[in-house]
Regions:
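Flexible beta->alpha loop and helix N-cap segments adjacent to enzyme active/binding sites
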Residues: 1-147
Length: 147
């Protein structure tokens, strides 16, 4: 699991978020995605307060506008994020402040059948050749000029 590291992230409220990520990852449309959620909001969204930092459990999705992370059985495999997650927590907290949504669709940064990208050169090449808008590598923020 990428768990916020070497991950592709997208706003789950975007109507076609799942289609966008499937196109980037070149994968089948039926495969589900997981989510990262601020720990303090997990009960509201998944009906449980079991700390789940490693995506070991699923929860019943309680919100109707999150089709991109809701599996066919009405559940989502999610990761709880708290202060111990450092920068990833700060990113998710700021996203919540900006949008009112305390979670992001989170999937591993790879394409179908390939391993997670493991070095800067391959990651930058993938970014250049894909439809990804923004790439964050450490403290470097790269914004696609094609968008």
């Amino acid at each position: 699991r990428a768990l916020g590291h070497r991950s592709l992230l997208i706003n789950p409220m975007i109507k076609n978020a799942k289609d966008i990520i499937n196109k980037v990852k070149k994968r089948e449309s039926y495969r589900p995605f997981g989510a990262s959620i601020l720990k303090e909001h997990q009960k509201e969204y998944f009906g449980t307060d079991i700390h789940n930092p490693h995506m070991l459990y699923v929860g019943n999705t309680t919100k109707n506008n999150l089709d991109s992370i809701t599996h066919i059985d009405g559940t989502c495999r999610y990761q709880t994020v708290d202060e111990s997650n450092g920068v990833y927590y700060k990113l998710l907290r700021q996203f919540y402040r900006d949008t009112g949504c305390p979670l992001l669709l989170n999937t591993s940064f790879n394409i179908n059948g390939k391993p997670i990208l493991g070095n800067t050169q391959d990651t930058k090449l993938f970014f250049k050749e894909s439809e990804i808008d923004v790439l964050v590598l450490g403290s470097d923020i790269n914004i696609s000029s094609q968008k």
